Curated annotation (Swiss-Prot):
This is StAR-related lipid transfer protein 7, mitochondrial. It is found in: Mitochondrion. GO terms for biological process: establishment of skin barrier; inflammatory response; mucociliary clearance; myeloid dendritic cell activation; type 2 immune response. Residues 1-61 form a transit peptide. Disulfide bonds: none annotated.
């Protein structure tokens, strides 16, 4: 159609009037085709919305998503964005993430027992990895630095490689509340709105029927003169009665139902892992906990200012959580029990029969394991 031209000549021709007109025509054609396909997709979505229930639509979209995942490029991401669907296959918290947090607690306990038996009371912040571990990954991790050392509260931090941020780790003990009470108060979003004065908004956006993960939107006040921050994150917890341990893992995600608001600063980098080890049982006073935390609050303040805010804010939050647990215990405030017997019974029934698609998460739990969020 066009004569062959050298690249430089072609670029000059496209920059001219005739070339500009051609590019404009191509752009208009692309906009027309894209708009037509988006309208067709919306019409199809409305049709399926009338024909199928919400659970059926989610299952259908899930199958469609799995087919798209094998295609090259960003077709699957684009389709998820256009349809306003949160892709659980990519974002749910996996069993491996929960187990990694529990393993960190075990390593810390093993090393602290060695130190105590040798007459040293300090808890080591970073136990050595087992022999044969990945040496490269160890080299990339910075050493932990003690920030606060009290009898029942120890706080460390370490730089996150390639950033100006720190990761924080707390190892602590409470002896006047039960693990069940402490765990339930931490998970109960409605009760937190009452005891945490910094909360502006806290609600569950979506739940995953497969893993029990939840997506939450949390808006919180930050110290003056900073703007309030908002977090969109997925969380999942697991309670292992056989091994006497409970774990809660959270991390930031993007969700189409919660677009960024100009009123708040969106925190896009956030991770938290809490592991609780009862001294005796879930319903007797006394437990140890390990909290590992990091986030990027998107501030312009120097690194030492941010570190000071987190280092002082973390003990304050944990003490408020502890006091809220005591208040709920002493005043018999009703708090949702996340460690109920019902999920355990359902899990045992599912194990005895062939698991159905709707009960994958129940069938995958052991007879002495509760898992829900």
């Amino acid at each position: 159609m066009f004569p062959r031209r050298p690249p430089a000549t072609l670029a000059a021709w496209l920059a001219g009037a005739r070339g500009g007109g051609l590019l404009s025509a191509l752009a208009n054609q692309c906009r027309f085709v894209t708009g037509l396909r988006v309208r067709r997709a919306q019409q199809i979505a409305q049709l399926y919305g009338r024909l199928y229930s919400e659970s059926s639509r989610c299952a259908l979209l899930g199958r469609f998503w799995r087919r798209l995942r094998g295609r090259p490029g960003h077709a699957s991401v684009l389709m998820a964005a256009l349809s306003g669907v949160f892709v659980w296959d990519e974002e749910r918290i996996q069993e491996e993430e929960l187990q990694r947090s529990i393993n960190e607690m075990k390593r810390l306990e093993e090393m602290s027992n060695i130190f105590q038996s040798s007459g040293v009371e300090n808890y080591p912040p970073e136990p050595k990895s087992p022999a044969g571990g990945n040496e490269k990954s160890k080299d990339k991790e910075e050493p932990w630095e003690m920030v606060m050392d009290k009898k029942h509260f120890k706080l460390w931090r370490r730089p996150i490689t390639g950033t100006h941020l720190y990761q924080y780790r707390v190892f602590g003990t409470y002896t006047d509340v039960t693990p069940r009470q402490f765990f339930n108060v931490q998970l109960d979003t409605e009760y937190r709105k009452k005891w945490d004065a910094l909360v502006i908004k806290l609600e569950v956006i979506e739940r995953d029927a497969v893993s029990g993960s939840e997506v939450l939107h949390w808006v919180t006040h930050f110290p003056y003169p900073m703007y309030s921050r908002d977090y969109v994150y997925v969380r999942r917890y697991s309670v292992d009665q056989e091994n006497n341990v409970m774990v809660l893992v959270s991390r930031a995600v993007e969700h189409p139902s919660v677009p960024e608001s100009p009123e708040f600063v969106r925190v896009r980098s956030y991770e938290s892992q809490m592991v609780i080890r009862p001294h005796k049982s879930f319903d007797e006073n006394g437990f140890d906990y390990l909290l590992t935390y990091s986030d990027n609050p998107q501030t312009v303040f120097p690194r030492y200012c941010v570190s000071w805010m987190v280092s002082s804010g973390m003990p304050d939050f944990l003490e408020k959580l502890h006091m809220a647990t005591l208040k709920a215990k002493n005043m018999e405030i009703k708090v949702k029990d996340y460690i109920s017997a019902k999920p355990l019974e359902m899990s045992s029934e599912a194990k005895a029969t062939a698991p159905s698609p709707e009960r994958k998460n129940e069938g995958s739990c052991g007879p002495a394991r509760i898992e829900y969020a």
